[in-house]
Every structure is written in structure tokens, then in C-alpha cells.
């Protein structure tokens, strides 16, 4: 019985067309590299960096550019950073402030539910799990393989709804975080698709 309940929970999470929820992920710092250097996580996942070994005294994990969402500070061999939690969808490049050639990237997709429907279906698109002071969200959409178009810009809502009554097709959505005070932005999140019949 317990296995059935767990399996149903996993299927429900995957039905959101995003990544399944993760409690924590650790990136290792080894030999002047972040491992893994490319990471895809669900919003709200706690990410830590652990410095295993290397030929230097310290490393950092510092988010690129003026968005400035995190900087772990110096990590010595054997130390683990405090958790970084990315609450909104987007793509977040980062580097070691001491060794700029050490780079990594974290991708956080939006979630859509359901992923298929009809012209009477209202689709839910989740951009973030919690409001973040000073941050807003931009959303783009495209029909099929068409060009990306701005749909909503600078919104504070964590969830938006989409209904398309004018026939079927495939729609894609992606979002990013931006800082209201200076306009700094994350990269666009991985795109998610809905199909309308």
C-alpha cells in the first residue's frame, strides 16, 4: 500500500511538467571545477557547495552579474556553504570569485498544470514558490515553433493562468526573475509546453 501511495505522489509531481521537488542538492568543488557544473532543480531546492579538495586555500560560489542573488563567501577545504534556495524559475550562471574560470549554471523551470487540455481548459503556470522582496517576474510565450513574445512583464504573482479558446495547438512558456530596483535579470527558464486539442 505504501509503495502505491509513493508512486502516486511521484506521478502527480511529474504531471506538473517541471522537475520533481527535491529537498537538497550538493555541488562539489574539486580540482578547480564545480561538479556538476550544470544543474537543473525545482524551485525551492536547497543547494549547497562543498569544497572537497584542490590546490588553493579557498573558493566561492557567486551568482553572476548585478542580480546578485547569492555569494557563499570563501570556503576552505572540507567546508560546506550555507544553503542557497532559488524560489523563482530562471537560469542562473555563477562563478568562483577567486578563480573566474570556474563556472557553473543552475536552471529552474516553471511548472505547468495540466500539460494537455482543450480550448475550455485553464492552464496554471507557476513561476515561483514564494514572493521575494524586490523581485518580479517576466513571462514569454510562443505558439508552436513561432517567435517568443512578451506575455507578462514585471508581475509579482507567483501563479498565472492561461486559456486559449481559438483552436488547438502547442504553446511554450518560460520566465525569468528581475530585480525591480536596477532591472537586473536572470536568464530565461527552461521552456515548458502545453498541448491544446
Regions found by a protein language model. Name each.
Residues 6-13:
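Hydrophobic helical h-region of N-terminal Sec-dependent signal peptides
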Residues 110-197:
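Low-complexity, Ser/Thr/Pro-rich intrinsically disordered linker/stalk segments at domain junctions
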Residues 1-4:
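Positively charged n-region of N-terminal signal peptides that target proteins for export
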Residues 13-145:
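Extracytoplasmic copper-binding redox domains, predominantly the cupredoxin/blue-copper superfamily
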Amino acid at each position: 500500500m505504501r509503495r502505491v501511495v509513493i508512486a502516486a505522489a511521484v506521478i502527480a509531481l511529474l504531471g506538473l511538467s517541471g522537475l520533481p521537488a527535491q529537498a537538497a542538492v550538493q555541488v562539489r568543488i574539486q580540482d578547480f571545477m564545480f561538479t556538476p557544473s550544470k544543474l537543473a532543480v525545482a524551485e525551492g531546492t536547497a543547494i549547497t557547495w562543498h569544497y572537497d579538495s584542490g590546490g588553493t586555500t579557498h573558493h566561492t560560489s557567486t551568482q553572476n552579474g548585478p542580480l546578485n542573488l547569492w555569494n557563499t563567501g570563501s570556503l576552505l577545504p572540507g567546508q560546506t556553504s550555507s544553503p542557497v534556495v532559488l524560489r523563482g524559475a530562471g537560469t542562473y550562471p555563477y562563478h568562483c570569485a577567486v578563480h573566474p574560470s570556474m563556472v557553473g549554471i543552475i536552471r529552474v523551470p516553471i511548472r505547468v498544470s495540466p500539460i494537455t487540455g482543450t480550448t475550455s481548459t485553464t492552464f496554471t503556470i507557476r513561476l515561483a514558490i514564494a514572493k521575494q522582496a524586490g523581485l518580479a517576474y517576466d513571462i514569454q510565450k510562443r505558439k508552436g515553433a513561432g517567435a517568443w513574445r512578451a506575455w507578462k512583464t514585471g508581475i509579482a504573482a507567483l501563479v498565472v493562468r492561461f486559456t486559449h479558446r481559438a483552436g488547438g495547438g502547442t504553446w511554450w512558456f518560460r520566465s525569468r526573475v528581475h530585480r525591480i530596483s536596477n532591472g537586473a535579470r536572470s536568464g530565461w527558464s527552461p521552456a515548458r509546453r502545453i498541448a491544446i486539442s
